């Protein structure tokens, strides 16, 4: 692919982005074997603040209230969002590299949410969903010619600011575990064109969901013992989908990741099952500190997933678990010598920018 694209005007920029991304991630192990934990503090040299900040990534979802949205006359903007935009301004994803540089000094990487891609004034960049009565605008379509030009503009802005994409948190591909094979294959198709987009902007990893929040079959009691046959076909389909995507991801040079995010993969054991069955270095975990069903999963779930992660972790403070011990979560990363990127995802109410800054400080202070 590289040889065929040398004539592209943006290829030098993409090489620049890829070189930056590999620098931090290269030292991380790609194996999936659980290892014993040694005392990190005894073995590792304490890093400077600037060195720690190079491991951090801004999170566009955390400040999505500040982004320009499609105008809907029947849905006026809430007063609290208007106040935030008066304070920080309104912007698009094209502005996010500069926002990251200016708002979080020292942070050079970004975690970009899929629903914020595109120019909301240009419908040609989006899918069109036809109903009996109307055509509704859907998700950003990275394969559209106008979208490819948009992504090149994003690359230019990243190069000019020195702030580049590490990861795409993607909600666009759906139904990867669905029992309807037509829907599942469509989800795979969408994920592949997004992997191409991730490659275009120089991201090294991309999260894809297994399915919607409703897919979480529960056990039933049979002969006095819990049994859950209902979940098996969903797991089987997820495994097949991620096998195909991992092969495609390897060719693109972008890792496909599974986050504890909704439904089937809200349980870390299901993520481990999928990853072990796929058994491909281009398919790994991207754990989130807080996306758990209950409080006892907060730290134990992270310990289960972190050996399978080399590219991205979401450091989250969330209203569901407002008292999450961020330092304890980071100690788990330290113990496993995690060297991938850490995206700061604040979702605990109030001012999202100030909340992100505080969370960033908490994570950096706990890193070694």
Per-region residue spans from a language model:
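Active-site groove signature of glycoside hydrolases
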Residues: 198-224, 252-261
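Hydrophobic residues in well-ordered beta-strands that form the structural core
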Residues: 58, 167, 207-208, 258, ...
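Surface-exposed cleft-lining segments at the edges of enzyme active sites
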Residues: 177-183, 220-234, 258-260
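Short acidic/histidine-rich active-site segments
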Residues: 341-347
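N-terminal pre-domain/capping segments
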Residues: 4-205, 232-233, 280, 284, ...
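A short helix->loop->beta-strand "cap" motif at the edges of active sites that frequently abuts
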Residues: 163, 254, 336-340
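Extracytoplasmic/secreted cell-surface and envelope-processing proteins
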Residues: 217, 265, 352-353
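Acidic/histidine-rich catalytic cores of soluble enzymes
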Residues: 70, 109, 228-335
